[in-house]
């Protein structure tokens, strides 16, 4: 990706690539209000939350104009905007300095501005305003989005300058991301716009234009193609009104507590159940750990997912944790073999310097500096996040049953039970036992970390064959071992020796003093992606998709069926500090019918039914 090639014609921002202005400097916010945000007035009284989508974020003028409208309102705005070439921070600041308006908004945006990485970047802009900045070409990023907009702002550069954003395929995607009754507004009355809207199912009307523009286009979606591609990955039914509803989250690791926090923030009365007598007794219970993404070659889905999760986690922890629990000093991930050197160096021409930078002269190996990586105290984070919740300790899950009143009755092994409206399993390594009858390929992996008396004065995590965190409270953590399907709660001397061997490039391990060890169990999936989403109806899938070997490319397969209001967020492996936050946000998106916080292709990779679907497509079930 590249930033916008922007210049100034006097005080007017001008895009050199498209040979067009972003807007006129004669109070352009008034045109934004007239053409675009006035559409909100037509439906303002009918809803409490709105999804507004836009083709062409540009300088963010329409977004800021909407922010002003929602500033003193209890209503919620979720704004989704695509952008091929984001404007540089310094140019954004200059634009609004020249305009003399929205200065506080632009400073806030600049402080949260995403790196130049294609995909969806979620920004919690205000308590009632969410911004999804979607970087990429319109025809490539729109198919990756999933929501039903209330209003569309069609605000790309003029059709004569940038025809690709007004193409037939783009209009089809706009219709897919709408519902019957969705409003579309644009300043343009060009033929390509009118034909594109009509062919996509919109009823077009021409309205009086702003100032010197004679007319503008307004349209309402009349009909929609309901054929589903990839029907087996269709979204579940949302919960509907949250008013008075309860949520039960099982598990008090990072995944469980982050999920509980997101649901509570959105109006649910949340209760958390924990099998043990305290929080974070398993994989989230380490004294110190690193927040860093798995870096693959560019474009690999596993790496794309980890970068998205990492960026969501960085924003979450910065907004919700005290600085004493996490330090964003960056991290160095060393390429200790030729394959890793190839992988990391392939990012050099990807304009990703805001995220990480490859340095072949680092010692003891070439490596990448991951700018916003951090070292954190997972156990203390869990204690902090749990402080505002009702937690039922010594409540180990046993079974569930759906009641006629729509609620779910959950029974625990201590003979107690609880009714809830929604149920979320954040059960880590216990998930393989709970969901043993599901085709999910979950396994438990034993991991041991070693606690050293401080031996290296590193200010950031160093990662090669193993990792070493900075010393915290007189303890330096190194790790970690991996032993799939092994159960042994007692630390092993040979595992401590392995951990020391794996960090021997960084210090003389013969001088290391071991002062302790910790064993935890992580959950892993068979394809290394977490398992996040609505829990599918296994029998429905086997019955209705048994012919996928022949029909997988058709659009007439029945829509997926799910166990009502049951969700899962587990199999986070060794990078749960990042992916658990993605899971919390994604489940909340599904529950509330919000836009998805991750691209559809990655949503499919996380889907709990993906292993079953792969077998059905191969005719193996």
UniProtKB/Swiss-Prot annotation:
InterPro entries: FAD-dep_OxRdtase, FAD/NAD-bd_sf, MnmC-like_methylTransf, SAM-dependent_MTases_sf, tRNA_MAMT_biosynth_bifunc_MnmC, tRNA_MNMC2, tRNA_S-uridine_synth_MnmC_C. One of its GO terms (molecular function) is tRNA (5-methylaminomethyl-2-thiouridylate)(34)-methyltransferase activity. It comes from the Bacteria. GO terms for biological process: methylation; tRNA processing. Its cofactor is FAD. The keyword Oxidoreductase applies. Residues 250-621 are annotated as: FAD-dependent cmnm(5)s(2)U34 oxidoreductase. GO terms for cellular component: cytoplasm. It catalyses: 5-aminomethyl-2-thiouridine(34) in tRNA + S-adenosyl-L-methionine = 5-methylaminomethyl-2-thiouridine(34) in tRNA + S-adenosyl-L-homocysteine + H(+). Coiled coil: none annotated. Keywords: Cytoplasm, FAD, Flavoprotein, Methyltransferase, Multifunctional enzyme, Oxidoreductase, S-adenosyl-L-methionine, Transferase, tRNA processing. Gene3D superfamilies: D-Amino Acid Oxidase, subunit A, domain 2, FAD/NAD(P)-binding domain, Vaccinia Virus protein VP39. Residues 1-222 are annotated as: tRNA (mnm(5)s(2)U34)-methyltransferase. Its EC number is 2.1.1.61, 1.5.-.-. SUPFAM superfamilies: FAD/NAD(P)-binding domain (SSF51905). It is found in: Cytoplasm. In the N-terminal section; belongs to the methyltransferase superfamily. tRNA (mnm(5)s(2)U34)-methyltransferase family. Catalyzes the last two steps in the biosynthesis of 5-methylaminomethyl-2-thiouridine (mnm(5)s(2)U) at the wobble position (U34) in tRNA. Catalyzes the FAD-dependent demodification of cmnm(5)s(2)U34 to nm(5)s(2)U34, followed by the transfer of a methyl group from S-adenosyl-L-methionine to nm(5)s(2)U34, to form mnm(5)s(2)U34. HAMAP family: MnmC. This is tRNA 5-methylaminomethyl-2-thiouridine biosynthesis bifunctional protein MnmC.
